[in-house]
Each structure stands twice: as C-alpha cells, then as structure tokens.
Regions:
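Feature captures the catalytic ectodomains and active-site-proximal regions of enzymes
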Residues: 1-438
C-alpha cells in the first residue's frame, strides 16, 4: 500500500472578490508546488457536509475523514473536551467557548432576548490578542471564584481565545438541546452551523424549540445562564483585564458558549472502518479530539512556532513519522484566521507560506512513486462575509498510480474541470484509500 499524506488547509476556499478582479485568495496566491501536484494528478471539488450548510470545523472534519456527521456527531463541546484532556460523562454538558469582550446594555424590546438587560458584543475573540497565558490565568480565576447552586463545572482555556466548559448538575442529567449564547452560530438539528446574519449580542440560553418541557434541557439552560452571569462578574473585575484595558487592549470579560453536547460519540476506529493505520498532526483541540476518538496516533508536533518555522518543522516531522503509519492526516489552520478577519491579503500570504514552507520541503524529499498526496479544505471561509460558507472546496490527489487530468492549477475554478468531479465530504476517504491500494 502506498503512503497517504492527507493535508487539510483550514478555511482555504473563498468567494471571488472584486478587490482581486473576481478571483479568490487561493487563485491569486503563488503556489507552484500545489499547482505541480494538481497538474500531475486528479482534481475535483467537494461539498464537505451538505448543500446549504455552512459547516463548523468539527462536522466538516468528521465528513472529510469519512464519517457522516449526521450519524456520529454529538456536539463540538465533547470533541474539544476530549482534545483538551477533560472527561465528559453522559449527562454532563460540554461546550466549546470563546473569550469575548462585551458591554452591559439595557434592552427594551426588539431584541432576541426581549426586555431583559444583557450584553452587547464588542469583539467575539478579544481582538485576537489574548495570550494563552492570560487566558489560562483568567480561566483559573473563574474556576476558583465561581460557585454554582447544586452544580459544578470545569473550565479550561485551550488555544488563544478558545476554551471548553463542562457543566455537571447535582440534580440530574443535562441535555444539549439548548441554544448557543454565541449569536454567530446556530443549529441545524444536531449540527453547528455558521450564521450569515445575527444580532451582535449575547443570547440568553433557552431550550431548543420543541424541548421547552424537557427538565434536562431546562436545567441545562438555567445552569448555563447562571454560569455566564457569575463568570462575567469575575472576569469583568479581574486584574488581568484591568491591566489589558490600561494597555489599550480589549478585556476578555465574557465567555460565549456554543455547540453543547451531553455525551461523547462512540466511533468505529478509522483502521477498522477503512484499513490504514493513520497518524495525525493537528493544531486545535477539536481536531485532536476527533483524531483520538477515531483511534489515530497523535504525532507530537510544535504548534507555538512562527508559521513559516512551524510549516518547515511539520514537513520534516511528517517525513519521519510516515515510517510508523500507513498515512498521516495533517490539519493546518493558517488560511482560516485571516479570512474570519476579512483580510484577503493576509490569507493570500498564509497560503503562499504553506506552499513555500510546507509543501516545498515535503515534496523535495518525497518519492511520489510510492506515496499519495491529497489536499483539500474542511470548509470555505469567506473574506467578504468573515464567516464559513457552504461553498465547495478544491481537492487534488497526486502521486503513485494517479494520471493527470489536464488541470494545471490548484484553485476553486480550475478544480471544477477535474476528473474527480463533484464529491461529498465522506466520499473522499474511500476514494483515497482505494487509490493508495492500487
């Protein structure tokens, strides 16, 4: 069996932009190594989860690793908790959370929260400059100072402004059938999706429609709202945030919750499902949690270097680690972050850095007669909309036994002319494994 390098470039896809003469950041970026792979292989385009679904990364990663998220997904919170090493038992409620900046506001109708006073969101990510050290210190302060009525919690900062929250009630199990307090994300059934339009204010958590009479959902919403109020009081008074404000920075004074889950999914291992023994290189807790639940090996790789240094080190480690596995799942966060900020120039530079500092050294040392390289994205992240979209993402598969299909560049438009055609996310892995087996 030929070795598999399955590389996911987070948020790579995008919309054509007027500022780029109708092209996307990927189409503008100088990517000679990705273009070479595309020219030597087969290309196609992928709807990762479904038409009309702007997926969050968790459900998209499920899909592109070959697992139907409609069947297996139980919420992003449990996945991130597993990735962060926090236990989630059945009946606990685990959330993915963001540190955010808010201001108190008085409301009088017209709000999604009615007349109840609440919080206007100033920045959902604290200006993206909350250090991991600050976030960990704030989380520890909340853990020490917040006391809940007949309940307990575990709050842990993970990377930057991100974290996880696990709530546990002494009065009975909690249900995940509750709304997000983060207005940027909604639900389609059990799946978390990015919303195009929303009020920029914290949402009071309530049971999802149809679950208003469920005691577990009512208990979960009440407990979440209690925790949000009490944690705000601690964070807003924190000396860490006072210091940030004195430095002209935004305070991380609120925690936005989303994508709760009340149990961890039970998955058939990747090896049992598809055959290959896979290892992974990932940056974020959600991908780490998914990989662990699928039984993948975790390659210890640095995530705290400057991007170019990290890409070069990852390429070096991938060439070493592949000797112990049939394939590697490599997830690179780079392009997603500037797209959320609406910065198409930074997204272009990120893509170019990945091409020059990850793919260049990888391909220089890789024998493509004995290996396959597949490159795609988990979702599109639109610079214009600053959010995930349901837009298809390009896919290339190049290497051993793969003939060229006449496509000579890697990009959203070119991929539509490729021999692979239009695939759904869960179709990628069976095709890739089949090609690897020759």
């Amino acid at each position: 069996m030929n070795k598999i390098f399955y590389v996911i470039l987070d948020g790579l896809g995008d919309d054509p932009l007027d500022a780029l003469d109708g092209r996307t950041p990927l189409e503008v970026a100088r990517t000679p190594h990705l273009d070479r792979l595309a020219a030597q292989g087969r290309n196609g385009y992928v709807t990762t989860v479904g038409e009309g679904i702007a997926p969050e990364s968790d459900i998209a990663v499920f899909a592109i690793l070959g697992y139907d998220p409609h069947e297996h997904h139980t919420g992003r919170g449990p996945l991130e908790s597993v990735g962060a090493g926090v236990e989630v038992n059945d009946g606990d409620l685990a959330y993915r959370v963001n540190f955010a900046t808010v201001e108190r506001e008085a409301r009088s109708g017209g709000s999604q929260n009615g007349d109840q006073d609440g919080w206007a969101i100033v920045d959902r990510r604290v200006g993206r400059d909350l250090s991991s050290e600050e976030a960990h210190a704030l989380a520890e302060e909340v853990q020490r100072k917040v006391a809940l009525d007949k309940a307990s919690f575990e709050f842990k900062a993970t990377v930057g402004h991100r974290g996880i929250l696990v709530l546990r009630s002494d009065e009975g199990p909690l249900s995940a059938e509750v709304e997000n307090s983060d207005p940027d994300y909604g639900r389609q059934g059990s799946l978390g999706v990015a919303l195009e339009t929303f009020d920029n204010e914290v949402v009071t958590v309530t049971p999802v429609t149809g679950n208003e009479d469920d005691p577990a959902a009512e208990r979960a919403s009440d407990l979440t709202n209690e925790w949000l109020r009490k944690s705000f009081e601690v964070l807003d008074a924190s000396e860490i945030n006072a210091k940030r404000k004195g430095e002209g920075k935004l305070p991380g004074n609120f925690i936005l919750t989303r994508d709760g889950g009340d149990h961890v999914p039970k998955l058939v291992s990747f090896k049992e499902k598809f055959g290959p023994e896979m290892g992974c290189f990932v940056e974020m807790p959600v991908e780490l949690g998914i990989a662990r639940l699928m039984g993948m090996g975790v390659v210890e790789a640095p995530t705290d270097l400057r991007p170019r240094e990290q890409y070069e080190r990852w390429a070096e480690l991938a060439l070493e680690a592949i000797e112990g596995y049939d394939g590697l799942y490599i997830h690179i966060k780079g392009p997603d972050v500037p797209a959320h900020d609406g910065d198409h120039d930074a997204k272009i530079h990120s893509i170019e850095d990945i091409d020059a500092h990850f793919f260049a050294p990888l391909l220089d040392s890789l024998d493509l007669r004995r290996a396959l390289v597949a490159v795609t994205a988990d979702h599109s992240t639109s610079c214009a909309r600053k959010s995930h979209t349901d837009g298809p993402v390009p896919l290339l598969i190049s290497g051993a036994g793969v003939s060229a299909d006449g496509v000579d560049t890697y990009g959203e438009t070119a991929s539509r002319n490729g021999a692979l055609g239009h695939l759904m996310g869960p179709q990628i892995m069976p095709n890739l494994v089949k090609l690897a087996r020759g």
